[in-house]
Curated annotation (Swiss-Prot):
Protein known as: Chaperonin GroEL 1
Transmembrane domains' residue ranges: none
Gene that produces this protein: groEL1
Major location category of this protein: cytoplasm
Organism in which the protein naturally occurs: Mycobacterium sp. (strain KMS)
Listed GO MF terms: ATP binding; ATP-dependent protein folding chaperone; isomerase activity; unfolded protein binding
Presence of keyword Nucleotide-binding: yes
Catalytic activity: ATP + H2O + a folded polypeptide = ADP + phosphate + an unfolded polypeptide
Family: Belongs to the chaperonin (HSP60) family.
One GO CC annotation: cytoplasm
Alphabetically ordered keywords of this record: ATP-binding, Chaperone, Cytoplasm, Isomerase, Nucleotide-binding
Domain of life: Bacteria
PANTHER family on file: 60 KDA HEAT SHOCK PROTEIN, MITOCHONDRIAL
Biological process per Gene Ontology, one example term: protein refolding
A Pfam family: Cpn60_TCP1
Length: 540
C-alpha cells in the first residue's frame, strides 16, 4: 500500500488539530459541573457518559494525519486509566495544553529535544511534590470522600467506602449489574470459590440447600480420590476426632464418593467433597493458597505425601465452611497470620513482576482471597443507558478509592496542580535555554485542569486560576458550590496516584508530539485507484 508523508511544521500542525479535536470532546466533562457526551453505537441505543477514557476510545478521525495526534492523546487517557483507573480527563487536558504551548515555541525556533527535556524534568519535580504533599487515607469516611468526588454521587461514595473498609487493602471490590433498581453491596467473608458439592446428598440444611460444617477439618488433594482403601484410614481417624471433613480434590469419585455419601445419609460422618477450582498450574497454586489459609498441607504423591499414609496433622482447619451446589466459602481458616502474610507478600511480588493484564487480574483475585475479602457492588438503574453510566461511575469510584489508599490524597479540583508550581522554583536554577522554556511550558499547562473545571461551571477560568494560585495549600475552588475554601475539609480531594499518573503520562505524550519531524500514513484506497496526487495542507 502506498504511503503519504508530511514533514516538519505541516506534520506537527496536523497532529495538533487531532489532539485538539479529541481533547475538546473530552474536556467538557471535567469537574462536578461538567457536561455529558453522547456516543452513537453501531448497535443498541446511544451511550451517555462523562468518563474521559470512554469518550477517547470512541474517537477515530477521518484525516489520517490528524488521527495520529488524536491516537497519541488517546494513549494518555488509556495509560492513566490502566495505572490509576481515573483522572483520564485531567491527563487529556494537560496533554493538550502542553502540546499547544510547546508547538508554539517549536514554531518560534526552540529546540524540541531540549524543550521536551525541560517538560520531563518539570513533570518529575511536580510528581515528587504531589507525593510529598499527600495525606494518607485509611478510614471509611476518607475513602468515601474520594469515591464521591470521582462518581459525583454520595450514595456510590458511601457504598465504595463501606466495601473497601470491609475487605481491607488487598481485598477485591468488583462491580456487577443488578437485576433490581437498587444499588447494593454484598460482602463475602473468608475464602470463596465457584465450585460446589459433588453430590446433593451432602446437604445438611435442606431449607437453604447448603452443607454447613462447623469447626471442620480440611483435606486438600492434588489428584483424584477414587480408591476407598486409600481414603479409609484417614476417614477413621477423622471419625474418632468427631469433626466434620471438607475434601477438596481434583475429583472425588467411585468407591470413595459412595462411602462418603452413605456416611452422610446415615449421619455417621459429616463430610463434603468438592472439586478443586481452575485447571493446571492455577489449580495447583490455588490449592497451595488454601493450604496456607487453613494451616494444612496439600496431599501430593510427587513430594512423598500419600493419602493412605497421612494422619490428621496434614489436615487444615476452619471455623466454618458453607458449601452450596455451585460455591464454597471457608471462614476463619486455621492458618497462621505470619504464613498468610508471607504468601501475600510473595503474590504482591508476582503482581509487580508480571506483564500480562490477565495474569495480574488472577493474581490480584488470589491475593484478595488470601486477605479474606471479596465485595460485590451490584448496580441498579431504571434504564439500560442509565445503568451503563452508573456502572462506569462505580468502577471509576472503586479505582479512585484504591489509588487513594495506595498513595494518599491531595487537594482536588485542579488546585493541587496549580499549587505544585512552587516545586518548579528550585528547578529553575538548574536549567537554561530551551530546557528552561520547557519548564515554563509545563508551568503554564498546570493550570489547564482548574481552568476547565471553572469554565465548565460557567465562570471565567483565568480569574479562578489567579485566585487559587494565591491561596494557601489545601484551599481552592469548589465547583460544586462555586465557592473558594478549604477543599480537604469539604471532601474535594483527588488520589495522588491519579494526579501523578496524569502529569507523567501527559508530559510523555507531549514530548512525542513536539519531537515529531515526519508523519507517515497509509494512502486512502480510493485515491490510489484514481491515481490522483494528494496535497495535504492545514491552515495555521
Amino acid at each position: 500500500m502506498s504511503k503519504q508523508i508530511e514533514f516538519n511544521e505541516t506534520a506537527r500542525r496536523a497532529m495538533e488539530i487531532g489532539v485538539d479535536k479529541l481533547a475538546d470532546a473530552v474536556k467538557v466533562t471535567l469537574g462536578p459541573r461538567g457536561r455529558n457526551v453522547v456516543l452513537a453505537k453501531s448497535w443498541g441505543g446511544p451511550t451517555v457518559t462523562n468518563d474521559g477514557v470512554t469518550i477517547a476510545r470512541e474517537i477515530d478521525l477521518e484525516d489520517p494525519f490528524e488521527n495520529l495526534g488524536a491516537q497519541l492523546v488517546k494513549s494518555v487517557a488509556t495509560k492513566t486509566n490502566d495505572v490509576a483507573g481515573d483522572g483520564t480527563t485531567t491527563a487529556t487536558v494537560l496533554a493538550q495544553a502542553l502540546v499547544r504551548a510547546g508547538l508554539r515555541n517549536v514554531a518560534a525556533g526552540a529546540n524540541p529535544i531540549a524543550l521536551g527535556a525541560g517538560i520531563s524534568k518539570a513533570a518529575d519535580a511536580v510528581s515528587e511534590a504531589l507525593l510529598a504533599a499527600a495525606t494518607p487515607v485509611d478510614d471509611k469516611s476518607g475513602i468515601a470522600q474520594v469515591a464521591t468526588v470521582s462518581s459525583r454521587d454520595e450514595q456510590i461514595g458511601e457504598l465504595v467506602g463501606e466495601a473497601m473498609t470491609k475487605v481491607g487493602h488487598d481485598g477485591v471490590v468488583t462491580v456487577e449489574e443488578s437485576s433490581t433498581l437498587n444499588t447494593e453491596l454484598e460482602v463475602t467473608e473468608g475464602v470463596g470459590f465457584d465450585k460446589g458439592f459433588i453430590s446433593a446428598y451432602f446437604v445438611t440444611d435442606f431449607d437453604s440447600q447448603e452443607a454447613v460444617l462447623e469447626d471442620a477439618l480440611v483435606l486438600l488433594h492434588r489428584e483424584k480420590v477414587s480408591s476407598l482403601p486409600d481414603l479409609l484410614p484417614l476417614l477413621e481417624k477423622v471419625a474418632e476426632a468427631g469433626k466434620p471433613l471438607l475434601i477438596i480434590a481434583e475429583d472425588v469419585e467411585g468407591e470413595a464418593l459412595s462411602t462418603l455419601v452413605v456416611n452422610a445419609i446415615r449421619k455417621t460422618l459429616k463430610a463434603v467433597a468438592v472439586k478443586a477450582p481452575f485447571f493446571g498450574d492455577r489449580r495447583k497454586a490455588f490449592l497451595d493458597d488454601l493450604a496456607v489459609v487453613t494451616g494444612g498441607q496439600v496431599i501430593n504423591p510427587d513430594v512423598g505425601l500419600v493419602l493412605r499414609e497421612v494422619g490428621l496433622d496434614v489436615l487444615g482447619t476452619a471455623r466454618r465452611v458453607v458449601v452450596t451446589k455451585d460455591s464454597t466459602v471457608i471462614v476463619d481458616g486455621g492458618g497462621s497470620a505470619d504464613a498468610i502474610a508471607d504468601r501475600a507478600k510473595q503474590l504482591r511480588a508476582e503482581i509487580e513482576a508480571t506483564d500480562s493484564d490477565w495474569d495480574r487480574e488472577k493474581l490480584e483475585e488470589r491475593l484478595a482471597k488470601l486477605a479474606g475479602g471479596v465485595a460485590v457492588i451490584k448496580v441498579g438503574a431504571a434504564t439500560e443507558t442509565d445503568l451503563k453510566k452508573r456502572k462506569e461511575a462505580v468502577e471509576d469510584a472503586v479505582s479512585a478509592a484504591k489509588a487513594a489508599v495506595e498513595e494518599g490524597i491531595v487537594t482536588g479540583g485542579g488546585a493541587a496542580l496549580v499549587q505544585a508550581r512552587k516545586a518548579l522554583d528550585s528547578l529553575r536554577g538548574s536549567v537554561s535555554g530551551d530546557e528552561a522554556l520547557g519548564v515554563e511550558v509545563f508551568n503554564s499547562a498546570l493550570s489547564a485542569p482548574l481552568y476547565w473545571i471553572a469554565t465548565n461551571a460557567g465562570l471565567d477560568g483565568s480569574v479562578v486560576v489567579n485566585k487559587v494560585s494565591e491561596l494557601p495549600a489545601g484551599q481552592g475552588f469548589n465547583a460544586a458550590t462555586l465557592e473558594f475554601g478549604d477543599l480537604l475539609a469539604d471532601g474535594v480531594v483527588d488520589p495522588v496516584k491519579v494526579t501523578r499518573s496524569a502529569v507523567l503520562n501527559a508530559a510523555s505524550v507531549a514530548r512525542m508530539v513536539l519531537t515529531t519531524e515526519t508523519a507517515i500514513v497509509d494512502k486512502p484506497a480510493e485515491e490510489e485507484d484514481h491515481g490522483h496526487g494528494h496535497h495535504h495542507g492545514h491552515a495555521h
